[in-house]
């Protein structure tokens, strides 16, 4: 097996302020805690097209954020391309995200004053591994691949939601990451554009063999992935 993501007994607990102990003479308050994830384990192999699914509050976005090194693990560990995240500091996590992970967000997260091509170029510029000419060539090519030929010089505000999400996909893909994480990528799109985006991602997954992991409760997305990891109340749901 060629595991690109390995999740080992992961727990995530959030502190939600303080509350006084009932029926206690103690003056000290206790911290209220929410257990977002509780003992989750799973493995995702290279090239898989996978969804983390579940109802609102199930922990799917929390798990995606932990895989993406956007949040800290309370206990357990997650390995991305062989690298454990639990012991990493902020600088190490930033470097991992920059080099190994591509992100696709439901709100696109594009910089409004930059053109489509400039938004895509940013991901490569942060790597400091390519010349200016290479950055432009790679960005141009990937925008063509996602169907935005002729739109490279347009600002996000001049494009539809589906086109903006294509820029987001191109930005994630251009640096050839080990894994792409997509948080509800169709949530802001109509059914037609949702279908087009998922079909595009399937094609790119097959062509480039890049692991894609979605968090979603969209039935259409779940019907089109090859594997579903289901969560309920912060735990794996095997029903």
Residue ranges and their predicted role:
Residues 228-239:
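H-loop (His-switch) and adjacent beta-strand-loop-beta switch element
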Residues 3-224, 228:
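ABC family nucleotide-binding domain
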